[in-house]
From Swiss-Prot:
This is Small ribosomal subunit protein bS18. The gene is rpsR. Keywords: Ribonucleoprotein, Ribosomal protein, RNA-binding, rRNA-binding. Part of the 30S ribosomal subunit. Forms a tight heterodimer with protein bS6. GO terms for cellular component: cytosolic small ribosomal subunit. PANTHER family: 30S RIBOSOMAL PROTEIN S18, SMALL RIBOSOMAL SUBUNIT PROTEIN BS18M. Belongs to the bacterial ribosomal protein bS18 family. Gene3D superfamilies: Ribosomal protein S18 (4.10.640.10). Pfam families: Ribosomal_S18. The keyword Ribonucleoprotein applies. It comes from Chromobacterium violaceum (strain ATCC 12472 / DSM 30191 / JCM 1249 / CCUG 213 / NBRC 12614 / NCIMB 9131 / NCTC 9757 / MK). The keyword Ribosomal protein applies.
Length: 75
């Protein structure tokens, strides 16, 4: 009685929407890729391609530095 795992096909949101560059000022977009505790959600969970994951990480870090996003959930 092995338990069957259903794997959903992951897709990259940025290639589907045709986004070329991720901007650090689009806070609503960046919040979708941050967990409740403030950590960046990895690409293996979100399905984001490596190129966009690097852009996403850089944009989130810039937004944190400029105080558009909090570093943790306790701020």
């Amino acid at each position: 009685m092995a338990r069957q795992l259903f794997k959903r096909k992951k897709f990259c949101r940025f290639t589907a929407e045709g986004i070329k560059e991720i901007d650090y000022k689009s806070v609503d977009l960046l919040k979708d890729f941050i967990a409740e505790n403030g950590k960046i959600i990895p690409a293996r969970i979100t399905g984001t391609k490596a190129r966009y994951q690097r852009q996403l990480t850089t944009a989130i870090k810039r937004a944190r530095f400029l105080a558009f996003l909090p570093y943790t959930d306790q701020h």
